[in-house]
C-alpha cells in the first residue's frame, strides 16, 4: 500500500522512541494481563467519573529535529549581554572535559539518589569531595552534600539556628542589611510560618537588639564590601547567639575561612565553580556547621563507613534526620539536593586543584583591582575600599552610564542609589575591563591595562591583611592529581563505572518515575542562549526564556486542569511548601488565618507532613482501610473535629499504595464541605497525564515533579523542579520575587527560591518532552506506564503477593510487593532481595515505603517488554533462591541473598559458601554484567563512627 507524505514524514516518531514496548509487545502484555486494548485496561482501572472525555489540547507530536529547531528559534530571542550584575550569580567557564564526560553523560545524569550505596559509590565519592571542598573553604567540621540554592540554605540556617539555640525564649533572627535581597526574601518567607521576627539592620548594630537567637552575616556584602566579622562574632558567641555567615566559594579561595573566625554555620552558592548561571539555576548550595550541631543539619550528608567485608565504603549518613523517616519532626522537608551541580563543582575543584583555583581567584581579583584603580584615576569614588570581585561605583549621571553599557551589550547592577555595581568573574578578560571603562568613563578614557596592572601589583590593599587566607586548602591527593585532561577523563569514567544508572538498566523505584531522559531533551540546556543569562538581567533580554516558560506553563495548565502555574519552586518539596503557603495566605485573606490543621493520610510520603510543619500547620493523620484507601469515615470525623480550623488535606493520586481510589472526588467534597482546600501531591502525575487531571478531580493546588513526569533527569539526587498549579482563587498567593517583578507574574507574595523561575535552565527539557510527544503521545505514555506496572504485578503476584489492588485486581502505575510473609517463613527480608537484585544488574525497588517490609515497583512507560521480562525473571529467580533457603538447602546465615551483593574480589578469593561462585556473581548469565565495587554497607558503623571528609587514596584502590 502506498504511503502518504504525511505518513512518511512520521511526525510522531519520538513517541515510539520514548515508549518502551512496541505495538506487538503491547499486545502480548495486554494478553498476559487479560485486557483487549490499552483503552479497555484504563477503563478497568481509572474511575469512570474522573476520566477525561477529550485529551488536553497541547498540540500534536513533532520530531526531535523539528522541536530542536523550534526551541532554537525561541532561545535566539534571548540577548547574550555580558552580565556584571553579581548578587550571587556570575559567568563561568565550565571545563569542556566536565561538560562532555559528566554533564552530558547519561551515566551521571540519569542516576537516582544514592539510597542504595552499593550501586552509587562513584557519585558518593564525588559528593564526598564536594564536602571536602566545603570543609576546607569554610573552616568548619561537617558539611552537607548540597542544598537547593543559597537563599534556601539561608532559610535552613535560620531554622537550624533556632533548633540548636540555648536561648529558648528568644524569637528574633537578625539579618545584616547587606545580604543579597533574594536571600532576605526567602528568609522572610520561612520566618513568617515559623513565627520568627526578622530584624534587618547594619551588622554593627546587631548588639543593640535583644532576644536574638541567630544572626545572618554576609562575608562579602551584596555590594562588594569585605567584612572582618571576627570581633563581632566573638561578642555574639559570648551572648550564646548562633552565627551564620553567607560566603562565596571563589572568594573563600583567597579570604579567611568564616569558621576560623568563630561562625557556627557557613553557607553559600557553589555556582561559580563551573555551573552556568542558566537564568537562575539549577545551582548547588554548600552548607557547613560545627560538629556539635551535626544531628541538626538539613539535607544529605555523605559519610565513610565499612562494607560487610570490612572495606571502606561510602553512604548517606544519619538519614534519621530526614523527612522520609521523621516526617513532621524532620529537620527540613527538603528531600532533593543538587547532586549533579554539586558534582560539577566538585570536579571543577578536582580539575583545577588548589593552585588553579588560586590562579583563577587571583586573576578575578587582579582585574577588579585594575578596574578600581582606573576608575579612581578618572575621579570616580568607590563606596567600599575592601573588595574581592565587586565594586560599588558612585556615578554622577547613572542613566548615561547605563545607556553606554547597554550600547556595549553590558549589564551593570542598577538598583543601588547613586551608584552602579560591577562584579567580575573567571570569564572576564582585559578586553572586558576596557569595555567597562568605556561604559563608565567614556570612549576617551585613555587607560591602559598593563600600566594599571603594574600600579596595583605594587600596592593592592583591597583585601585587608587580617582577611587573607593563611592556611592551605585542598591538600588531599584527589585535588592534586587529575589536572591533565586525560587523567581527568579517566577519573570521571572510573567514578561512573561504579554506579548503576538508566544507561545500563531499568531503575524500578516506586514513586520515583525513572523514565527516559531523551538526548534531544537534554541538548538545549547547554546552549549558550539558555546557559549564559543572569536571572536579574533586564527582562527584555530574556524574551526567549519568557516565551518558553509561558508555553510550558500553558501546556501544564491544560494537562493539570488548573488555571495558573508558578514556576518558582526548584524541587518537589519546595513545591509542596509553596502550595501550602498559598493555601495559608488564601485563608488569611478571608480572615480565616486560624485554619491551620492539615489532614494527611497515613500512606503519605514523608515530605508531606514535613512540608505542612514548615508551613506552620498542625498535622492530623487520616487512617487508611485494609485495602489501602483513605478511610472516608475517619476522614469525615477528622474534618468535623477540625471544623473551622481545617486548612487542607494533602492527598496523592493515584495513592502511594499504587491504586486509583474510587472515592477521590468524595474526599475532595468532604474537605471542601468543611472549608478546607485540597492539595493533590503531583508525585504520581505520570499516571494521570491525558487520562485525568487534578483540577478535573476537584483539587485546588498541586506541585508537579518535572523531574519525574516531565523528563528532567534525577541527576543522582537533583536537580528537580516542582512548579505548582493552582485554581484561580489561589493564584494571587503563589510565590513572587523581590528583585524580578515582571508583567505576568501572578503575585507579590514572598519567594521560596532564590531565582524567580527556580531552575529555569532545565525547563527546556520538559518543553521538549511535551512538544515532541503531543497530546496523544502524553496519554500513551501514561497508559503504557499503567500497562507495564500491571504486567509486572500479574507475572509476579504468585511469587510475591501484591499488597494493594483496585477494581478487578488492577494496580495503577506502580505496585507494592509484600515481602512480610516470606520473611516470616524464611527470614529473608526485603533488604536481602534488594541487594540480591544488584547481582542481577538492577537497582532495587523502593524499600519499606509506604509500608514496612515491602518493595514498591514503578517500571515507567520507557521500559521495553524485554527489560521488564529481565526484571521479572530476576525476581522469580530470587524467589526460587528463597525457596531453597526455606527448604534448608542453604542456611539462613549463608546464602546468595544475605551475602548479596557479590563483588569481583570475591570471585577470585577463597570460596567457602554452600553455593557456587557462578550463581553468586552471574545469576543472569555473562551478558552485560554490572559489578558493584563494595559489599553490603554497615549502616550502624557509619552512623556511630561518623566521618564525612575525604579518606586516603589507598582506600579506593
Swiss-Prot record:
Instruction: Give the EC number(s) under which this enzyme is classified.
Output: 1.4.4.2
**Which Pfam family, giving just one, matches this sequence?**
GcvP2_C
Q: Name one GO biological process term.
A: glycine decarboxylation via glycine cleavage system
- Keywords in alphabetical order: Oxidoreductase, Pyridoxal phosphate
The answer to whether the entry has keyword Oxidoreductase is: yes
Identify residues that carry N6-(pyridoxal phosphate)lysine.
708
State the reactions this protein catalyses.
N(6)-[(R)-lipoyl]-L-lysyl-[glycine-cleavage complex H protein] + glycine + H(+) = N(6)-[(R)-S(8)-aminomethyldihydrolipoyl]-L-lysyl-[glycine-cleavage complex H protein] + CO2
- Top EC class of this enzyme: oxidoreductase
Q: Which cofactor does it need?
A: pyridoxal 5'-phosphate
Q: Which GO terms describe its cellular component?
A: cytosol; glycine cleavage complex
Q: Which domain of life is it from?
A: Bacteria
* A GO term, aspect molecular function: glycine binding
Q: What InterPro entries does the record tag this protein with?
A: GcvP (IPR003437), GDC-P_C (IPR049316), GDC-P_N (IPR049315), GDC_P (IPR020581), PyrdxlP-dep_Trfase (IPR015424), PyrdxlP-dep_Trfase_major (IPR015421), PyrdxlP-dep_Trfase_small (IPR015422)
> What does the record note on quaternary structure?
The glycine cleavage system is composed of four proteins: P, T, L and H.
Q: What does this protein do?
A: The glycine cleavage system catalyzes the degradation of glycine. The P protein binds the alpha-amino group of glycine through its pyridoxal phosphate cofactor; CO(2) is released and the remaining methylamine moiety is then transferred to the lipoamide cofactor of the H protein.
Family to which this protein belongs? Belongs to the GcvP family.
Q: Which NCBIfam families match?
A: gcvP, PRK04366.1
Which protein, by its recorded name, is this? Glycine dehydrogenase (decarboxylating)
Q: Which organism is it from?
A: Klebsiella pneumoniae (strain 342)
Amino acid at each position: 500500500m502506498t504511503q502518504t507524505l504525511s505518513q512518511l514524514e512520521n511526525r510522531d516518531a519520538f513517541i515510539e522512541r520514548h515508549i518502551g514496548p512496541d505495538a506487538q509487545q503491547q499486545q502480548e502484555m495486554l494478553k498476559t494481563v487479560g485486557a483487549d486494548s490499552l483503552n479497555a485496561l484504563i477503563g478497568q482501572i481509572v474511575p469512570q467519573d474522573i476520566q477525561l472525555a477529550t485529551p488536553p489540547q497541547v498540540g500534536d507530536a513533532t520530531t526531535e529535529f523539528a522541536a530542536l529547531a523550534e526551541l532554537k528559534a525561541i532561545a535566539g530571542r534571548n540577548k547574550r549581554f555580558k552580565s556584571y550584575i553579581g548578587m550571587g550569580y556570575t559567568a563561568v567557564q565550565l571545563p569542556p572535559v566536565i561538560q562532555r564526560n559528566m554533564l552530558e553523560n547519561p551515566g551521571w545524569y540519569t542516576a537516582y539518589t544514592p539510597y542504595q550505596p552499593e550501586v552509587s559509590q562513584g557519585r558518593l565519592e564525588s559528593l564526598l569531595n564536594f564536602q571536602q571542598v566545603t570543609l576546607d573553604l569554610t573552616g568548619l567540621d561537617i558539611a552537607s552534600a548540597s542544598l537547593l540554592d543559597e537563599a534556601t540554605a539561608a532559610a535552613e540556617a535560620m531554622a537550624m539556628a533556632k533548633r540548636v539555640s540555648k536561648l529558648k525564649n528568644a524569637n528574633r533572627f537578625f539579618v545584616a542589611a547587606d545580604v543579597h535581597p533574594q536571600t532576605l526574601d526567602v528568609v522572610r518567607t520561612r520566618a513568617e510560618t515559623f513565627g520568627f521576627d526578622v530584624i534587618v539592620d547594619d551588622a554593627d548594630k546587631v548588639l543593640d537588639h535583644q532576644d536574638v537567637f541567630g544572626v545572618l552575616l554576609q562575608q562579602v556584602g551584596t555590594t562588594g564590601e569585605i567584612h572582618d566579622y571576627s570581633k563581632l562574632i566573638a561578642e555574639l558567641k559570648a551572648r550564646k547567639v548562633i552565627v551564620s555567615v553567607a560566603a562565596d566559594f571563589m572568594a573563600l579561595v583567597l579570604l579567611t575561612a568564616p569558621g576560623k573566625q568563630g561562625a557556627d554555620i557557613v553557607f553559600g552558592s557553589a555556582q561559580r565553580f563551573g555551573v552556568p548561571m542558566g537564568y537562575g539555576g539549577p545551582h548547588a548550595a554548600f552548607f557547613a556547621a560545627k560538629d556539635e550541631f551535626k544531628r541538626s543539619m538539613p539535607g544529605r550528608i555523605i559519610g565513610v563507613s565499612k562494607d560487610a567485608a570490612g572495606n571502606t565504603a561510602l553512604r548517606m549518613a544519619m538519614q534519621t534526620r530526614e523527612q522520609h523517616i521523621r516526617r513532621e519532626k524532620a529537620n527540613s522537608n527538603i528531600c532533593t539536593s543538587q547532586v549533579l551541580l554539586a558534582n560539577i563543582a566538585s570536579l571543577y575543584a578536582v580539575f583545577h586543584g588548589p593552585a588553579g583555583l588560586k590562579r583563577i581567584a587571583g586573576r578575578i581579583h587582579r582585574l577588579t583591582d585594575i578596574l578600581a584603580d582606573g576608575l579612581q584615576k578618572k575621579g570616580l569614588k568607590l563606596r567600599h575600599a575592601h573588595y574581592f570581585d565587586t565594586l560599588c561605583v558612585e556615578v554622577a549621571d547613572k542613566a548615561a552610564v547605563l545607556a553606554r553599557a547597554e550600547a556595549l551589550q553590558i549589564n551593570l547592577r542598577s538598583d543601588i542609589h547613586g551608584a552602579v555595581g560591577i562584579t567580575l568573574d573567571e570569564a572576564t578578560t582585559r578586553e572586558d575591563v576596557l569595555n567597562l571603562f568605556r561604559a563608565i568613563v567614556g570612549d576617551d578614557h585613555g587607560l591602559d591595562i598593563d600600566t594599571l596592572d603594574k600600579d596595583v601589583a605594587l600596592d593592592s590593599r583591597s583585601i585587608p591583611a587580617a582577611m587573607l587566607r593563611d592556611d592551605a586548602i585542598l591538600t588531599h591527593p584527589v585535588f592534586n592529581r587529575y589536572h591533565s585532561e586525560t587523567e581527568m577523563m579517566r577519573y570521571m569514567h572510573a567514578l561512573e563505572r561504579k554506579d548503576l544508572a538508566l544507561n545500563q538498566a531499568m531503575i524500578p523505584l516506586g514513586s520515583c518515575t525513572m523514565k527516559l531522559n531523551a538526548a534531544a531533551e537534554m541538548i538545549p540546556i547547554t546552549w549558550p542562549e539558555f546557559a549564559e543569562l543572569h536571572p536579574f538581567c533586564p527582562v527584555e533580554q530574556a524574551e526567549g526564556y519568557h516565551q518558553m516558560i509561558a508555553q510550558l506553563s500553558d501546556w501544564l495548565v491544560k494537562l493539570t486542569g488548573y488555571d495558573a502555574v508558578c514556576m518558582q519552586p526548584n524541587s518537589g518539596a519546595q513545591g509542596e511548601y509553596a502550595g501550602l503557603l498559598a493555601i495559608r495566605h488564601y485563608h488569611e485573606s478571608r480572615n480565616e488565618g486560624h485554619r491551620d490543621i492539615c489532614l494527611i493520610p497515613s500512606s503519605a510520603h514523608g515530605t508531606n507532613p514535613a512540608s505542612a510543619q514548615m508551613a506552620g500547620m498542625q498535622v492530623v493523620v487520616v487512617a487508611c482501610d485494609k485495602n489501602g484507601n483513605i478511610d472516608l469515615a475517619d476522614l469525615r470525623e477528622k474534618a468535623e473535629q477540625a471544623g473551622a480550623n481545617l486548612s487542607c488535606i494533602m492527598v496523592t493520586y493515584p495513592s502511594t499504595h499504587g491504586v486509583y481510589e474510587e472515592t477521590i472526588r468524595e474526599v475532595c467534597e468532604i474537605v471542601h464541605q468543611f472549608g478546607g482546600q485540597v492539595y493533590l501531591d503531583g508525585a504520581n502525575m505520570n499516571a494521570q497525564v491525558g487520562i485525568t487531571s487534578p483540577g478535573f478531580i476537584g483539587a485546588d493546588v498541586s506541585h508537579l515533579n518535572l523531574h519525574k513526569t516531565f523528563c528532567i533527569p534525577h541527576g543522582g539526587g537533583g536537580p528537580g523542579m516542582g512548579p505548582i498549579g493552582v485554581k484561580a482563587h489561589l493564584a494571587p498567593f503563589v510565590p513572587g520575587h523581590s528583585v524580578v517583578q515582571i508583567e505576568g507574574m501572578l503575585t507579590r507574595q514572598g519567594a521560596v527560591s532564590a531565582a524567580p523561575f527556580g531552575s529555569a535552565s532545565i525547563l527546556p527539557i520538559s518543553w521538549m518532552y511535551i512538544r515532541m510527544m503531543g497530546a496523544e503521545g502524553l496519554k500513551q505514555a501514561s497508559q503504557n506506564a499503567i500497562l507495564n506496572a500491571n504486567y509486572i504485578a500479574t507475572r509476579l503476584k504468585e511469587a510475591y503477593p501484591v499488597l494493594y489492588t483496585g477494581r478487578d485486581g488492577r494496580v495503577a502505575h506502580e505496585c507494592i510487593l509484600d515481602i512480610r510473609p516470606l520473611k516470616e517463613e524464611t527470614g529473608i527480608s526485603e533488604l536481602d532481595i534488594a541487594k540480591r537484585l544488584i547481582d542481577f544488574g538492577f537497582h532495587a525497588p523502593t524499600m519499606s515505603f509506604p509500608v514496612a517490609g515491602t518493595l514498591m515497583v514503578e517500571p515507567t512507560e520507557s521500559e521495553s517488554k524485554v527489560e521488564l521480562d529481565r526484571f521479572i525473571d530476576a525476581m522469580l529467580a530470587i524467589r526460587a533462591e528463597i525457596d531453597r533457603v526455606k527448604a534448608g538447602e542453604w542456611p539462613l546465615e549463608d546464602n546468595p541473598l544475605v551475602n548479596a551483593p557479590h563483588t569481583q574480589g570475591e570471585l577470585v578469593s577463597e570460596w567457602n559458601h554452600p553455593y557456587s561462585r557462578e550463581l553468586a556473581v552471574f545469576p543472569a548469565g555473562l551478558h552485560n554484567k554490572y559489578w558493584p565495587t563494595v559489599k553490603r554497607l554497615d549502616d550502624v558503623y557509619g552512623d556511630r563512627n561518623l566521618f564525612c571528609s575525604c579518606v586516603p587514596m589507598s582506600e579506593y584502590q
